[in-house]
Amino acid sequence: MNEKKELKLILVAARNHLSRGDLKLLLSYLESDDCEFEISLQISEPTEQPELLELHRLVAIPALIKVSPAPKQIFAGSNIFVQLQTWLPRWKQEGVTKDLGINLQPSKIDSIRTQKEFLLEEELLVLRQENETLTKRIESQERLLRMVAHELRTPLTAATLAIQSQKLGQIDIKKLQDVIKRRLEEIELLSQDLLEVGTTKWEALFNPQKIDLGNISAEAILELEKFWRLRKIEIDTDIPSDLPSVYADQRRMRQVFLNLIENALKFSENSGRIKITLIHKTNQWVEITICDKGAGIPVSEQKRIFLDRVRLPQTSEGTSGFGIGLSVCRRIVEVHGGRIWVVSEVGEGSCFHFTVPVWQGQNKDQQHLTKG
């Protein structure tokens, strides 16, 4: 009976990896009589032995390292057991030829090729990880650019409407100057955001503080007054006098109100009605609801409309879909720890709901909010 050759292995894996199917099969096989090697296996937790990552130049875990016999080999990925099974017969054959004293040149060539293949695989893994990191960074920057570009429309539209109102004699020159001054200040802040897009994270563009949502909703309604008055649309509000302050970024909350009210106006009939409700839902949250009596949204589309780059097809009388506004709203609400959703039925209209955290003396020096 042939004596089993020793095979020294190190499995670098976190505890949760060990419950994975392929690693369970691997460990079971190495402990069984079917394995034709005398196995010496060391299982290492990377957090307890981080030096192993550097020593063996590991770029991904779990990883199985063949320490001896030389040359060293490393297997990583989701099919470690399959990779090992491919190599076991080869290692056994190499052991037999060494016992017979046969020096096979092809074996040396294979060994060199194997090492080169391993180095190439390592480089490919590093490149994949770098590519993934860069892709995520580019996507994040694109989202920031879309948000800021979308937000630029508001002060520009307001300034244009103010100029038109002054020409029609609806406001005096002093009021026009005041509106233009405030809108230019908003554009200046947005230009600062644009300059920071390449160097900052999404959350860093938020400045949460104690604010009054009732005032913000009133400002948004007033800003869109020309649109709803022209179409004779009524806007009803239900805002309790004892509504608590919330902890949020004032500019971003204003943007959410403007986007949702604009959508409600867009999908409302002339002489229609929009209802805005603010409720102190729990000790932790204020819930805002904006309802219209428009065309409604199919159930199949109610989650998709909050995704990036999703626009519903034309709905009625030339009205285009929701576009970027709702994905921006979702990201703003989620950065504040809240959530946003829609309740809608085709032909019956839509109600958009979102939640904002109640002010509870949060640390004003807090740099960003936690995404919920």
UniProtKB/Swiss-Prot annotation:
Transmembrane domains' residue ranges: none
GO terms assigned for molecular function: ATP binding; phosphorelay sensor kinase activity
BP-aspect Gene Ontology terms: circadian rhythm
Keyword line: ATP-binding, Biological rhythms, Kinase, Nucleotide-binding, Phosphoprotein, Transferase, Two-component regulatory system
Domain named Histidine kinase: residues: 147-360
Tagged with keyword Nucleotide-binding: yes
SUPFAM superfamilies assigned to the protein according to its UniProt record, in alphabetical order: ATPase domain of HSP90 chaperone/DNA topoisomerase II/histidine kinase, Homodimeric domain of signal transducing histidine kinase, Thioredoxin-like
EC number(s) from the headed UniProt entry: 2.7.13.3
InterPro entries (UniProt xref): HATPase_C_sf (IPR036890), His_kinase_dom (IPR005467), HisK_dim/P_dom (IPR003661), HisK_dim/P_sf (IPR036097), KaiB_domain (IPR011649), Kinase_SasA (IPR023527), Sig_transdc_His_kin-like_C (IPR004358), Thioredoxin-like_sf (IPR036249)
Modified residues (Phosphohistidine): H150
Matches recorded under Pfam families: HATPase_c, HisKA, KaiB
Domain of life (superkingdom): Bacteria
Recorded catalytic activity of this chain's protein: ATP + protein L-histidine = ADP + protein N-phospho-L-histidine
UniProt keyword Metal-binding, yes or no: no
Assembly and interaction partners: Homooligomerizes. Interacts with KaiC. Participates in the KaiBC complex, whose core is composed of a KaiC homohexamer and 6 KaiB.
Domain description: The N-terminus interacts with KaiC, while the C-terminal histidine kinase domain autophosphorylates and is probably responsible for self-oligomerization. The N-terminal domain stimulates the C-terminus to autophosphorylate.
PANTHER family for the chain: HYBRID SIGNAL TRANSDUCTION HISTIDINE KINASE C, TWO-COMPONENT HISTIDINE KINASE
Function: Member of the two-component regulatory system SasA/RpaA involved in genome-wide circadian gene expression. One of several clock output pathways. Participates in the Kai clock protein complex, the main circadian regulator in cyanobacteria, via its interaction with KaiC. KaiC enhances the autophosphorylation activity of SasA, which then transfers its phosphate group to RpaA to activate it. In addition to its output function, recruits fold-shifted KaiB (KaiB(fs)) to KaiC to cooperatively form the KaiB(6):KaiC(6) complex (independent of SasA kinase activity).
Protein name: Adaptive-response sensory-kinase SasA
